[in-house]
Amino acid sequence: MKFTIERSHLIKPLQQVSGTLGGRASLPILGNLLLKVEENQLSMTATDLEVELISRVTLEGEFEAGSITVPARKFLDICRGLPDSAVITVLLEGDRIQVRSGRSRFSLATLPASDFPNIEDWQSEVQVSLTQAELRGLIEKTQFSMANQDVRYYLNGMLFEIDGTTLRSVATDGHRMAVAQAQLGADFAQKQIIVPRKGVLELVKLLDAPEQPVVLQIGHSNLRAEVNHFVFTSKLVDGRFPDYRRVLPQHTSKTLQTGCEELRQAFSRAAILSNEKFRGVRVNLADNGMRITANNPEQEEAEELLDVSFEGEPIEIGFNVSYILDVLNTLRCDNVRVSMSDANASALVENVDDDSAMYVVMPIRL
């Protein structure tokens, strides 16, 4: 195996592929990249057995077909350390990879390509296509609500639901929930999959060309996305996601409407003096006035008064201010609507001018 490539063509795909590996590999082979040259294409593959990322780069220089695995971190650091204008030659000699550029020479240990784990061949059951901007939007509007290391393993990820002509993303950690939707160009049978947290966070990094398409292939236990020159595959979480429709407040009797940024800043200031552990703030609503108060064990107090549009009977309700701020930081809209029924029921938060995302926040007792 042999290939020659300009550093500028190699470095970005190499960085993105290596990025999927994260921390220390559980097996030596998982710390390696699979390099494969066939025809005039170099493919680089990394996997941690949960997600797999393949990058394909067209070779313009001379090449010889073959495949081998090399230590990912060392190979990346060598290529990163070479000058921007460098031309890199990679050559397999025996069981060593020679990396050469200008007056620099490196000899790296290898492991056989046959040892590299392959996410098993699988059949795609559904294939959908949408723009990268649409998929990125679905993820960015909801990813903050994913659980992290929850014993309810099915919450440590994101639900994607195909429902007719709609693709939805749903995430919840049991305290708050986010739902977003985008329209598909065709009509599909209903299907739900749970993509693990790591798969979601790695996939969104690849979606950097808003107008370009992304093709999603969904199988029984895998999701594959073809994005630009990458093929991304993630195993799916084998579990049942809670019925998010039952969590959405159905009958609300109190509605607050106000500027999103004004509300965000008021909650941010009140949060400074909230209890560091429980992050509780008290909200009082009556007669188009809103009062936000917070205090902490040091007996320090914060109070914010806002003029708002409010319909319904007066209410006093408590929230974890971090959850409210996560929603408002994600919405970043002009005007926000908050719908409630009583102090013990969840609140529904929405952008007044856009119904493509909904947020549910559970109240807390103060």
From Swiss-Prot:
Pfam family, one: DNA_pol3_beta
Function: Confers DNA tethering and processivity to DNA polymerases and other proteins. Acts as a clamp, forming a ring around DNA (a reaction catalyzed by the clamp-loading complex) which diffuses in an ATP-independent manner freely and bidirectionally along dsDNA. Initially characterized for its ability to contact the catalytic subunit of DNA polymerase III (Pol III), a complex, multichain enzyme responsible for most of the replicative synthesis in bacteria; Pol III exhibits 3'-5' exonuclease proofreading activity.
Subunit structure: Forms a ring-shaped head-to-tail homodimer around DNA which binds and tethers DNA polymerases and other proteins to the DNA. The DNA replisome complex has a single clamp-loading complex (3 tau and 1 each of delta, delta', psi and chi subunits) which binds 3 Pol III cores (1 core on the leading strand and 2 on the lagging strand) each with a beta sliding clamp dimer. Additional proteins in the replisome are other copies of gamma, psi and chi, Ssb, DNA helicase and RNA primase.
Domain of life: Bacteria
PANTHER family: BETA SLIDING CLAMP (PTHR30478:SF0), DNA POLYMERASE III SUBUNIT BETA (PTHR30478)
Xref: Gene3D superfamilies: 3.70.10.10, DNA Polymerase III, subunit A, domain 2
InterPro entries, per database record: DNA_clamp_sf, DNA_polIII_beta, DNA_polIII_beta_C, DNA_polIII_beta_cen, DNA_polIII_beta_N
UniProt organism field: Vibrio cholerae serotype O1 (strain ATCC 39315 / El Tor Inaba N16961)
Name of the protein this chain belongs to: Beta sliding clamp
Location in or out of the cell: Cytoplasm
